[in-house]
């Protein structure tokens, strides 16, 4: 495992730019934020909006193996079943996301034939129910259904609306029709329920309702019968099950959903009026009810409580078709009225002169009005009037010779009688991605009116609309859509858009989600260094960086190359939030622990502030170019503001490739499961099938790079033009390697059964930067192979992407990894010795891969589970004694390869033991021989003798010793022993010693010593000659003797005659003691 304080030992051999790791990394300087996983490409299709996710405090062990990649994702909106695809190289597997993982609406959840994004919405037309109108009307419609979707209209289900007054069920039904699936359910209440006050539950009674009681409404969906009708269930069938809260075990009824509540009043509903003041004396009461052709609308003329007027003239004008049919005096004993009415063909006019007694203002209640007249307006049957018709009012006072301003009132004429209007939208949520992309996001809207008989009329052309807060959401001029354009400053839950038609007003509630700013930029490595030994071609105008200063000038290859810089992966994350309507707190779409990957949305708006320092490639890979500090930015598409910023440092330091992890990929498998904490998030696991199970089955390899600074990156993020790879087989009987013309990666082909580190991957620099004198190999890695042939079965042929055959143990490991709650501090990565098996598992499960690397057709692949020999390890798993699969793996027999390895190990151990015995015997014999040499006069014996002297004649005539070829000889140098006398030589002689150790025995090296002795009296020069001699082994088996012997030490002339050790006798004693020690 490697982390912030981890320290690992490494032994590496570097020869000619080749790095072959022998262990694990030493003293990692930093921890990469990018774990080592299978670098598969994941793609979601058939989804209108979907996001990959990152979980806060995510378990690092979830992605800790080169064999698999685990990614959570979220489907925000989809009409058809989404499909997730995982691919790597030529292998691909896809899976349809099942409906149970999408958490679709419970109303349509049991009906698979409808789109996933359909939701049933309800709108109660009038929440106040009176005894004179004992009818509850609710409009149902389908969100997510297009206005023009007519394919599924014939299969739309029925809706049942029901309530439980006085412990009895009252129900009504309707069938969804057309697009977007509209119907109105009408629930009729019995008269006795109003008189009894509706004996409802105590908690449902609200005293503030002034005598009214609440009644809860519910609905459920069920299919229509063969005739297309919606018959209701038998009376009382639901009573004992739903009202009592019990559920019948014998029969499962459709799930019910709550609609809302209505208030039931025992009184009659009064007409609704609107007051219009003509001046401080006269007030007109305008009815708000719709008027159809042939009907009459009554207007009331009253005096205010403070009025003292007793005579005035009222002038009225109306459009043609609106006629004054009657004028009635409310108090004939108090007021008299003279009428002048003209119901002409072009205009209706009337003059009403009112005279009465002076009113008694003290007898009126404060704030009340004194009614004088009732004026009836009738609608002509042949007028074809529709909409609001204006009526003008003006009052004059003859005595005072004054006149009021002209006041306009309206009467609403309709061909039909509306009871309310309802705005319909295709969705009740808006995801404001316009802030990120600059592209507006809109939701179509329609407005329909519901008549008394339950029929629905489209009134979209004659409505008015206005947003309650345009900083959250806007509405189009013709009221046919609501939209966001990226200029909004806020987001909100249940923000309101008002729609008005005639005198009806309806509010549409919509939730707007917006990205939380600033965005978060995640870079796997924010410190990029040069990679030692990896040279890439550079442009002619850029000065190349030399790897070393001692390169020969005649080397033309590589002269236009510079060192490669490290690469890092980049992604942009954010959270979608909305403010709560009451407290103003933030509400998260998936919760505060989730971040959405929005890199694809902002790729074209990402840039590096200093492109000469670093460069973005495809918006997801950051490559260093030259040392410096710069920032990666996400710019706003609508302004010059910066939405996100991250600092990156490109260093002049050099790192080496410490490890090259290799993973065999013979196919792909894919599994899905809900997240343990939030069921709306789905966790996908894409795994590599690494067991070759049929002869000539093909596979490719995947590789990761571990650098000496601790960062890890997949090799795939580097440009293929900057490197080349060579894959070779270490056992041609098990696997062979074939060249692939369509890809840079060679193909591994199964030949026979076996397993182990049998493939070797060599990574080399590109051809333009190769040097002629040495092969620039950057790193070598070994990958593990497992070939186990199994008999094919016809029932597994076909190429369907079945994931049921994924190894059970691997699935359990991934499940445990996802379900893990804690222990984050120990979840760090492990890098093991190359080729060292981390486990050996047998596989019995099966899977298929749809495509082969060369032929591009379906082949049978059976899953072998996790690789038993991964170069970078999978997360370790302890055997569970309660798990039968673990017991099976533990108790299996040894394979032929394992038996051979154990036998070879025993032979090695035996050889080592014999070697140790020989060493002991040799040491014992050598000890006796040394004692024998000492008894013969302390004649020193050494392999390194040095002859020193100042007689020119002696030095210029080296001794020629010729040995018979049949005699046993050993090479020594005549002279003093090197280990004790090397301090007598000058420095230049010492430097050449290491080169002389590898010279042959007949090689004579001469060098003049230029230093003069301290007592030199002339220009005579000292000369030193190194000569190799031999020691002759006596025929009688006695002790070794030298081929050239000297009588005494007096014949030796030393280079340094005075060592400061005292007189000559002391020096001789010192030398004799050293010889005795040898």
UniProtKB/Swiss-Prot annotation:
Glycans are attached at residues 343, 366, 381. It is a single-pass type I membrane protein. GO terms for cellular component: membrane. Pfam families: Ig_TMEM132_2nd (PF23481), Ig_TMEM132_4th (PF16070), Ig_TMEM132_5th (PF23486), Ig_TMEM132_6th (PF23487), TMEM132_3rd (PF23039), TMEM132_C (PF15706), TMEM132_N (PF15705). Residues 834-887 are annotated as: Disordered. Keywords: Glycoprotein, Membrane, Transmembrane, Transmembrane helix. The chain crosses the membrane at residues 904-924. Belongs to the TMEM132 family. PANTHER family: DETONATOR, ISOFORM E (PTHR13388), TRANSMEMBRANE PROTEIN 132B (PTHR13388:SF12). This is Transmembrane protein 132B. It comes from Homo sapiens. The gene is TMEM132B.
